[in-house]
Amino acid sequence: MAEQRQNLASLDSSIIDRLPAYSATLFDAKTQKRLTFESIAAHLGRSEVAVAAIFYGQARASPEDAEKLSRLLGLSAESPIAAQMMGFPDRGRAGPMPPVEPLIYRLYEVVQNYGYAFKAVMNEKLGDGIMSAICFNSKVEKEVDETGAAWVVITLKGKWLPFSRF
């Protein structure tokens, strides 16, 4: 029986100049240790998406996250990386707009094509407001249909924030 190769996400060198300096170190250690975001998330007690966001500098690590992640990746206790991961993120600058990476562009295209439809349905169900991306969580799952085709299921769960009247 053939050995199944593990898929590992790595850092795209074309965006490295848009990311925090620690991102490259985290990705290098992740690759050397052959760790998936799923396995790192299990170790940290966080979601895969949240952990990946820390690697890309789009989410802030808690002191516990930074300690566990540094230990798991074998980073020096004297390294400034833990403190950097706990700093305030500069969100939304990781890639160009519109996106050029095909998968990210497809997600952008989903919002372009269905954004107003999502908004209309949310407004009908919840009233005038917005979905929080702060009080938020997300997960990515794989489903296989009856024909054997793989499908991706992306869940975006955000707190509903009604607009206030003033």
UniProtKB/Swiss-Prot annotation:
One Pfam family, short name please? CYNS_N
- What family does the entry list? Belongs to the cyanase family.
- Source domain of life is Eukaryota
Q: NCBIfam families, alphabetically? A: cynS
| Species for this entry | Chaetomium globosum (Soil fungus)
Is Lyase a UniProt keyword of this protein? yes
**Name of protein:** Cyanate hydratase
Q: Name one GO biological process term.
A: cyanate metabolic process
